[in-house]
Amino acid sequence: MTKGKQLAKLAKKRKKNVPHGYKGIAEYHEGAYECNYVSPYSKSAHNENADVMLILQDWASDESLSRPKDPNIVSLGYSPELPTNKNLIALLDTHFGIPLSDTYATNLFPFVKLGNMSSYIPSRDLMEAAINFAIPQIEVVSPKIVICLGLRVFNTISKSLEKPTPKNLVEAIPNHFKYKDTFIWAQSH
């Protein structure tokens, strides 16, 4: 099975298995944000043969998706005007010399959390998402490096692979590890 078909199968799994207490991406604006990726962020970063893979924590909240439909999010899968997205794109260019489109980017938690963007997602839910979606995406894409944006993302991936979980980013950043042929790194978000 090709990488594209394997990733599409994971997207289909995500669509069919929305956990209790969360919403699916298709539940907003008549499905305008839905896609055939695990995360809509991949719309702009879906290089299946990427050397660099990015894993962000979560894609959206109920509050943010309940606002009027955003054409940028529909087409790109993210808001280019947000400072975190501008910073990420600049850092990719500065440190790797690549645009976002040369990466494979996804979210650890591919469902819509209730509340606002700072609403808490329990660790057990992040772990379930890592096992069912993030780790399989890493295995399919098989990049040289995965950059986990944020300590919770890095620690969830680490724990799901039975690796130590650092207490803070200062400890996490130098403590990358190898999973199969891929190095997993932590970085601040």
Describe the predicted segments one by one:
Residues P166-H189:
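Short, flexible loop segments at boundaries between secondary-structure elements
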Residues T2-I147, L151-P164, F183-S188:
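A polyanion-binding, active-site-adjacent surface
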